């Protein structure tokens, strides 16, 4: 895929870059695999704001994605590559030999007409899913399970890939896109290859309005608020923060570690992220 730029015909157009969408082969989603997606604007089940800067945006339908890849031994043909508004990656529509259709995250290099397989006996080929125990060391993988049978949770964003560095006892050792090295059970499944839509990192939103189309609301700095709204607020004119930076709720921020000290999974992390 390529990134499209525009002539600066207006201030809003000047820095905008968009995907060319040239890999997309089908514009309407598969009707049996979509469900309505309700907007929550960052509110939880009590109606309280738990995630800031969310709200508005274009209406979306949720595409049901097969993260488990548990349909073993049945070949699936790639019917289409589609756009998904709910993620940065593209999605691929698979038609299985028994008639079932499923969406998966589209890996880089996957084309319409390719035939994919899942299961321990699948070939080492882009788009095939198999347990880490059956994948050769050095292979790039994505959509990795943390718990066997739960479905892929790691490495699902556009252009990402993890590398299988080795196997030790019951665990595989992976290098994740963040730089973290961690152990994952060998029974956990992963999909071969790198996630597609590699150029996503080069896209510039370019104007505030386009962020609003995506459901992203403005981020107001605490230092420009009043003291009632933020610990950094107040002062005459343009004032410095005047203390160690804190969140709106008074917790230390900017460079402070937020990971729980005694988290059970810490023993599986060999090297923390950069």
Curated annotation (Swiss-Prot):
Stated family: Belongs to the universal ribosomal protein uL2 family.
Bridged cysteine pairs (disulfide): none
GO molecular function per UniProt: rRNA binding; structural constituent of ribosome; transferase activity
Originating gene: rplB
HAMAP family with a match to the protein in the record: Ribosomal_uL2_B (MF_01320_B)
Region Disordered, annotated ranges: 225-274
Species whose genome carries this gene: Carboxydothermus hydrogenoformans (strain ATCC BAA-161 / DSM 6008 / Z-2901)
Oligomeric and partner information: Part of the 50S ribosomal subunit. Forms a bridge to the 30S subunit in the 70S ribosome.
Record GO biological process: cytoplasmic translation
Keyword list, A-Z: Ribonucleoprotein, Ribosomal protein, RNA-binding, rRNA-binding
Gene Ontology, cellular component aspect: large ribosomal subunit
Classification via PROSITE patterns: RIBOSOMAL_L2 (PS00467)
NCBIfam families: rplB_bact
Keyword Ribonucleoprotein: yes
Protein name (database record): Large ribosomal subunit protein uL2
Short name of any one Pfam family annotated for the protein: Ribosomal_L2_C
Top-level taxon in the UniProt lineage: Bacteria
Function: One of the primary rRNA binding proteins. Required for association of the 30S and 50S subunits to form the 70S ribosome, for tRNA binding and peptide bond formation. It has been suggested to have peptidyltransferase activity; this is somewhat controversial. Makes several contacts with the 16S rRNA in the 70S ribosome.
Compositionally biased intervals (Basic residues): 257-274
